[in-house]
Swiss-Prot record:
Name under which the protein is recorded: Elongation factor P
Family (UniProt): Belongs to the elongation factor P family.
Compartments where located: Cytoplasm
Organism phylogeny: Bacteria, Pseudomonadati, Pseudomonadota, Alphaproteobacteria, Hyphomicrobiales
Keywords: Cytoplasm, Elongation factor, Protein biosynthesis
Pathway noted in the entry: Protein biosynthesis; polypeptide chain elongation
Record InterPro entries: Elong-fact-P_C, NA-bd_OB-fold, Rib_uL2_dom2, Transl_elong_fac_P/YeiP, Transl_elong_KOW-like, Transl_elong_P/YeiP_cen, Transl_elong_P/YeiP_CS, Transl_elongation_fac_P
Keyword Protein biosynthesis tagged: yes
Biological processes, Gene Ontology terms: peptide biosynthetic process
Example GO molecular function: translation elongation factor activity
GO cellular component terms, A-Z: cytoplasm
Residues passing through the membrane, by range: none
Gene3D superfamilies, A to Z: 2.30.30.30, Nucleic acid-binding proteins (2.40.50.140)
Its job: Involved in peptide bond synthesis. Stimulates efficient translation and peptide-bond synthesis on native or reconstituted 70S ribosomes in vitro. Probably functions indirectly by altering the affinity of the ribosome for aminoacyl-tRNA, thus increasing their reactivity as acceptors for peptidyl transferase.
């Protein structure tokens, strides 16, 4: 653990508050006309996902947990959870479905991901920005329907719904942003 002043806390930092780990969602410094400047920190408890909001004086000391980011390869999912392997040491880590959240829909076997590790336990996952998936179903194009929205609904091979341009048909491979599930481009493979 490293003690840092509250004003230096940034999004993505992991803080140790009363023995529990929290990931910082937002951190804003406020300087009111009168009074002491404060840092407003919105955090999510890693153990159970509860969101909390704390105010610290900007000079107050907070404990930042030492978190190591390491590349791992996604192996498989079973009843125990999602299994990842460090390609250098061949050590395996397991993350629960709750820890991964909505990102689990984009995990593919053999995919390289970044895991945030604290004391040997994976606490957060960062997927590649884009993944390539196949369109399983989409609505047919109605000729001359250009006055309305230029995107149509589609279902991806992982079951996620997204919007795609009218020229995309079922069976087409497309690049999808993992952050929000939006269409990026047609795959070039």
């Amino acid at each position: 653990m490293v003690k840092v002043i509250a004003s230096s806390v940034r999004k993505g930092n992991v803080l140790d508050v009363d023995g529990k780990l929290y990931v910082v969602l937002t951190a804003q410094n406020f300087h009111p006309g009168k009074g002491t400047p404060v840092t407003q920190v919105d955090m999510r408890r890693i153990s159970d996902g509860v969101k909390v909001s704390e105010r610290y004086r900007t000079t107050e000391q907070v404990e930042r947990a030492f978190v190591e980011d390491r590349e791992h390869t996604f192996l498989y999912e079973d009843g125990e959870g999602f299994h990842f392997m460090n390609p250098e040491t061949y050590d395996q880590l397991v993350m629960s479905s709750e820890d991964i959240g909505d990102l689990k829909a984009y995990l593919q076997e053999g995919m390289a991901v970044m895991l945030s590790i604290h004391e040997g336990i994976a606490i957060a996952i960062d997927l590649p920005r884009h993944v390539t998936l196949e369109i399983t179903e989409t609505e047919p194009v109605v000729k001359g329907q250009t006055a309305s929205s230029s995107y149509k609904p589609a279902v991806l091979s992982n079951g996620v719904r997204t919007l795609v341009p009218p020229h995309i048909q079922a069976g087409t491979r497309v690049v999808i942003a993992t952050e929000d599930g939006s269409y990026v481009e047609r795959a070039k493979d």
